[in-house]
């Protein structure tokens, strides 16, 4: 073996040690790989991508399984361990997974209930955002002003003069039209001049095409801000709160507790108006890529490096 090799060997060993120490950054100091999922709608996909980007920036190796489907397949994947975390809503946790009959209107109580209830699956809820992705009703500004409609009560009083568009099952679910009709049976009854069903993803088209006066909405829909619509106030507290939060397997959080602070830093930034604007960048005329929108938002708020 040559003298030159022996002189070079210490340098190689030092470099190898350095690479090993630094290269482990992609797997975090603990070497943990995290699989991040999401449901198959714009908002949930956006927030899931943000979780993934934040964790990657913190040094974790991240696998993405985004836009898996609806609540059922995504939650099952989490329970089975195919996912480690995904964005879920407190209202969904209560009414779907925990099967609570009465909707919870208080955000803090909703959080306390899901945190306690999800212990049976060894799952933990981190800090929820203030954004409330709950159901409601949206109208064009000129229509709302014409009839003086600002609240659900106002809508009930004028319902017989208006046309409603709604997504599948809204006319048969107790937390939809039937429940509202019971509440307002002496105030217009929530009985519309005409009502028709439309695919969930197309629910704003009838307003655009002047085929309906009112549509069922979600509080963080990008179309509300993008189209300049009026979101009616739920003055009777009919719909439960739906605050989004990271839902994560306890074993992963125990192994890397720093995950909590990293993801919790996002919560205060996800307000109704912020999420509406994010959704509109994807669903509006610009049709930006979800990955681009999520990354730029995090860079702008200094949650990840540019």
Label each PLM-derived region with a short phrase.
Residues 17-21:
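C-terminal motif of bacterial Sec signal peptides marking the signal peptidase cleavage site
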Residues 23-26:
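Bacterial signal peptide processing site
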Residues 53-54, 72-83, 101, 179-183, ...:
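Short helices/loops that flank or line small-molecule/ion binding pockets
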Residues 135-145, 243-256:
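A bilobed periplasmic-binding-protein/Venus flytrap-type ligand-binding module shared by bacterial periplasmic
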């Amino acid at each position: 073996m040559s003298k030159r090799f022996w002189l070079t060997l210490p340098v190689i060993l030092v470099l190898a040690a350095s690479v090993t120490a630094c290269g482990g950054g992609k797997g975090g100091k603990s070497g943990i790989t995290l699989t991040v999922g999401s449901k198959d709608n714009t908002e949930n996909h956006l927030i899931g991508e943000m979780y993934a980007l934040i964790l990657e920036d913190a040094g974790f190796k991240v696998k993405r399984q985004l836009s898996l489907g609806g609540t059922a397949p995504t939650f099952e994947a989490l329970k089975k361990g195919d996912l480690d975390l995904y964005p879920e809503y407190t209202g969904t946790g209560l009414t779907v997974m925990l099967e609570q009959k009465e909707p919870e209107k208080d955000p803090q109580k909703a959080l306390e209930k899901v945190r306690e209830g999800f212990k049976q699956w060894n799952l933990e809820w981190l800090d929820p955002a203030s954004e409330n992705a709950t159901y409601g009703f949206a109208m064009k500004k000129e229509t709302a002003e014409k009839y003086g409609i600002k609240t659900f009560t106002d809508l009930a009083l004028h319902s017989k003069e208006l046309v409603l568009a709604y997504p599948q099952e809204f006319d048969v679910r107790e937390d939809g039209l039937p429940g509202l009709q019971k509440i307002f049976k002496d105030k217009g009854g929530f009985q519309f001049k005409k009502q028709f069903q439309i695919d969930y993803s197309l629910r704003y088209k009838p307003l655009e095409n002047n085929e309906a006066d009112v549509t069922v909405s979600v509080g963080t829909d990008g179309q509300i801000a993008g189209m300049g619509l009026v979101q009616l106030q739920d003055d009777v507290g009919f719909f439960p709160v739906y605050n989004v939060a990271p839902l994560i397997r306890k074993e992963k959080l125990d192994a890397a507790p720093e995950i909590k602070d990293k993801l919790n830093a996002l919560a205060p930034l996800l307000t109704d108006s912020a999420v509406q604007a994010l959704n509109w960048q994807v669903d509006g005329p610009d049709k930006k890529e979800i990955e681009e929108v999520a990354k730029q938002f995090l860079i702008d708020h200094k949650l990840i490096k540019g």
